[in-house]
């Protein structure tokens, strides 16, 4: 066991020091030369072992991507990415925990199904643009912490102008778990393949309001038609919609219905 109050980088020297000091009443006393030699020996050992220990520590920190998950952009031809939680253009106003790269990770089954949707839209000159895919549980925890900070309303005007932040949990906008963490849910919209411009959906992604409900009739007729087109393409591809968010779809036959993953997006 290591001695207490020993700096992490000096743990070998801490062990050596304890060996020397454990029996102060002993007749065996190390002289100055022997002590210096011990110092040099310990430091030499540390110089050799520390890089190895750092590599081992790094390896433990590098949580591998499960073999059942893929980078959807390598499966879905022409998929447009706008990964909102990798940056600060989101309802929190900052990069979200767990998003280390702007990738769309999905279970292999969900990515394959999404590729079929993309192919079906190509005939119309349309394609898919994703905002979020797999979401680590630590990201959900970040949302929960933010929701409890009632005074943090940096993005209120853009994402929840008509909503009191204190009702986010009550009204279901924020929860302790998210289907995204199971790897088969995706937030997305439609774009024109010619120029990448988004179709009018009557409101932005992550807008906390009944106006985001797919059935909301207060948006323009064109927006209603575009929402219906997206929903039709996704349901035909094997996804089910969510009645509170026009952009949110989950693979009906998801492979991990009871598992909430927490590996980082990297």
Model segments located where?
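Extracytoplasmic cell-surface/polysaccharide-interacting catalytic and binding patches
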Residues: 60-133, 137-244, 253-266
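Cationic, amphipathic, low-complexity segments that mediate targeting or membrane/lipid association
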Residues: 2-3, 21
């Amino acid at each position: 066991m290591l001695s207490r109050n020993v700096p992490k980088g000096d743990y070998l020297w801490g062990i050596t020091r304890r060996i020397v000091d454990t029996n102060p009443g002993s007749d065996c006393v190390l002289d100055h030369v022997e002590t210096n030699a011990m110092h040099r020996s310990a430091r030499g050992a540390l110089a050799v072992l520390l890089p190895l220990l750092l590599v081992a520590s790094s390896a433990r920190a590098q949580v591998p991507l499960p073999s059942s998950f893929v980078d959807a952009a390598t499966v879905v031809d022409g998929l447009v990415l706008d990964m909102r939680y990798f940056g600060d253009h989101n309802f929190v106003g900052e990069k979200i925990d767990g998003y280390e790269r702007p990738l769309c990770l999905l279970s292999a089954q969900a990515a394959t199904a999404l590729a079929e949707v993309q192919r079906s839209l190509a005939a119309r000159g349309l394609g898919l643009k994703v905002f979020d895919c797999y979401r680590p549980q630590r990201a959900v925890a970040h949302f929960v912490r933010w929701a409890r900070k009632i005074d943090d309303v940096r993005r209120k005007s853009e994402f929840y102008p008509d909503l009191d932040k204190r009702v986010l949990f009550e009204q279901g906008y924020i929860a302790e778990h998210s289907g995204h963490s199971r790897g088969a849910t995706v937030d997305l919209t439609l774009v024109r393949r010619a120029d990448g411009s988004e179709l009018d959906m009557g409101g932005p992604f992550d807008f906390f309001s009944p106006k985001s409900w797919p059935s909301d009739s207060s948006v323009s007729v064109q927006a209603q038609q575009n929402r219906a087109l997206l929903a039709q393409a996704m349901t035909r591809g094997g996804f089910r919609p969510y009645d509170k968010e026009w952009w949110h779809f989950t693979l009906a036959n998801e492979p991990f219905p009871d598992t909430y993953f927490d590996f980082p997006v990297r």
